[in-house]
Design a protein with these regions (language model features):
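Positively charged, small/polar-rich N-terminal and surface patches that mediate targeting and assembly
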Residues: 1-102
Length: 102
């Protein structure tokens, strides 16, 4: 199981992307977290932007397709896409994910 993180500039974009990911069966669950402030360097300048974080729960076998999907459907030219390997999760949750995502 992976938890994939990506950020978007608005709640509306986050909800739209989350729904598309779920409809495509690329993840079992996507959560859109409330607004936060991100700091990063872009084109040599420090940026400070309001963003929303998506937590995407999926299987490792879905990662490559999910990454391509996010890249194709994201408003950023270089979206943050970071996968964290989940060391442990409850057996019922993992079974549900595997059944849903294949």
């Amino acid at each position: 199981m992976l938890i994939v993180l990506t950020t978007v500039p608005s709640e509306d974009e986050g909800k739209a992307l989350a729904e598309k990911i779920i409809d495509a069966r690329l993840a079992a669950c996507v959560q859109v977290l409330p607004q936060m402030t991100s700091f990063y360097v872009w084109e040599g300048e420090t940026q400070r932007e309001a963003e929303h974080l998506l937590l995407i729960k999926t299987l490792g076998s879905k990662y490559d397709e999910l990454e391509r999907f996010i890249t194709a459907n994201h408003s950023y030219s270089v979206p943050e896409i970071v996968a964290v390997d989940c060391e442990r999760a409850s057996n019922p949750y993992l079974s549900w994910m595997k059944e849903l995502l294949g």
